[in-house]
Each structure stands twice: as structure tokens, then as C-alpha cells.
Amino acid sequence: GRAIDFLQNPASKKGRIIACIGDSLTHGNIGDCWVERLRDEFPADTILNEGINGDVVWQVQQRVDSILSCKPDIVVLMIGSNDAMASFNANSGKRYMRNNKLSEIPTFERYKKLLPELLDSLSGASKVALCTIPPVGENPDSAVNQHVKMFNEFIELTAINKNISLIPVSRLLWNDLSLRAYPFRKDYDPKALPIIRRIYGGMMHHYIFKKSWNDV
């Protein structure tokens, strides 16, 4: 459930309250959901899935009060992938601003201002863990992954400055990808149509042809 569900039924509380905050990578409605895995691993705790598809850091800021109303013991924050994609080029930025109804295009400079502010607002939780964001495609030298790397370097620095735990999602995924026994054939295309084709193509292979997400 989400914070809004918990606040409507506080009697559902069990164990620690763990709030997992982020975007579609946390929501997990397409692909494997790491929040569901946490629920399986820690059944005695209340785990809130506060991932919303497409969210940038500013949007998380706007909804953080309802999450804090649940008095979470632990917060896991992974936010920045959409900020990185929106700031990758002008067309992506305009698309995010239009689709998310934002007052301005997300930029790296704005992210550097808003992420520390968001972490300050979460400081009431007993434990806060900040995640780096995953790669886009499998080519570490691609322009988009160099752009993502810039965000991750700032995330790592922020975790040090705020003295909070860092979960190195990016490094762990790159380590895993380095073990692959197949060559990558495609890489990220910032245009909307190729992205949609790849997303829905992956969904078809998984849900219709029953391939595992790893095989997809």
C-alpha cells in the first residue's frame, strides 16, 4: 500500500514502517518490483510503496508531507532517473514538462538544489538510505550514461555530506552487466517512439510469451 492507504487505516501497522520513495523504478508496475521483494523478505514490517511513474525530484517534494505523516522508521529514496532523462536534451525536457505538468524543465542544477532539500525534510526518520540511479542501456560510455554518471556522482557526494547510507544501485548493476555472456545490440534512444516500442515489446515478451525479465 501507499501512505494514503496507511493513513486511512492506521490499524494496519505492523513492525517498522519502511517508506520506499521514488518513481516508476520503485513503483515497479512493469518489470520486477524490488519493493515487493522487500515485503517478502520482511513480512513483519509495514512497507509503503511511494513510487510514482514519471516523478522528478520536485514532484516527490510536493508529496513528502503525507509520507512523513506515517512516521516512517526507515526511508529508502531512489529519485533522479527522470530528472536525468529530462535534462539529457531539449526535446526530452519539453516532453517531461508537458507530460508531468511542470512549471519548468528539470535540470541538473535544479536537481542539485532540490535533492539536499528533500533529504533535509526526511531527516526525522530514524534511518534514511539514498540510492544511486541505474544505468540506461548497457553501454557505459554512451552519452546518456555519462549524463547519468554525473547525477550519481552528486548523489554519492550528497550521501557523504548528509552522513546517510548509500545504496550503490548503479555500481551493482554495472558489475552484474559486466558478467553478461551476450553482446548488447541496442542502446538508449531519447526519442519517445523507440522508447515506447522497447517498453511494450518487453511487456509482450514477458506477459504474453512468458519470458522472464532477465531473458527479456
Model-identified regions with their sequence ranges:
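Conserved beta-strand elements of the Class I
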Residues: A19-I21, L48, V75-L77
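Short histidine/acidic/glycine/proline-rich micro-motifs that form metal-
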Residues: S24-H27, G51-D55, P135-E138, S142-A143
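Catalytic nucleophile-elbow at a beta strand-turn-alpha helix junction centered on a G-D-S/GDSL motif
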Residues: G15-G31, V35, N82-A84
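Alpha-helical cap/lid subdomain in secreted, periplasmic
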Residues: S12-K14, R37-P43, Q59-V216
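Short intrinsically disordered, low-complexity coil segments enriched in acidic
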Residues: G1-I4, A19, K127-V128, D215
